[in-house]
Amino acid sequence: MSGWIATSKTRMQDFWSLLTFSSDLVDVKDSGDYPLTAPGLSWKKFQGSFCEFVGTLVCRCQYILLHDDFPMDNLISLLTGFSDSQVCAFCHTSTLAAMKLMTSLVRVALQLSLHEDINQRQYEAERNKGPGQRAPERLESLLEKHKELH
């Protein structure tokens, strides 16, 4: 996990360095040349790393932060605020981040749905076994898992 944190911190620093140069970006606004569309390997790498960061953030935090309204509300507010910006770089970067965030959230929801289906089938299969073959502990653990998933 510490490797992921270090990599994420680097990616987040790249993102924040982009946002802190707002005065430079205002001048760039009219030219249309900003980090997400800028030529060069380093900017292409930034775009890929930025998209990967958002997806990885959601994936790694799916059991913790996604169930807490405070961080998600603030992240959505931040992205919404930047998407309303007159600075194209802020607007487009936050829109891209919002799209990646939503895509990642849909993936998490799909995984949860698949886990629910598998759990339900396992529970039904165990319940349909004969009284001598049925494992009460297994039924109980599957029922607890079912409650966790809902």
Swiss-Prot record:
Which domain of life does the UniProt lineage start with? Eukaryota
Pfam families annotated for this entry?
Answer: STAG
Similarity section: Belongs to the SCC3 family.
- The protein in question is named Putative STAG3-like protein 4
Q: Which organism is it from?
A: Homo sapiens
Q: Which gene encodes it?
A: STAG3L4
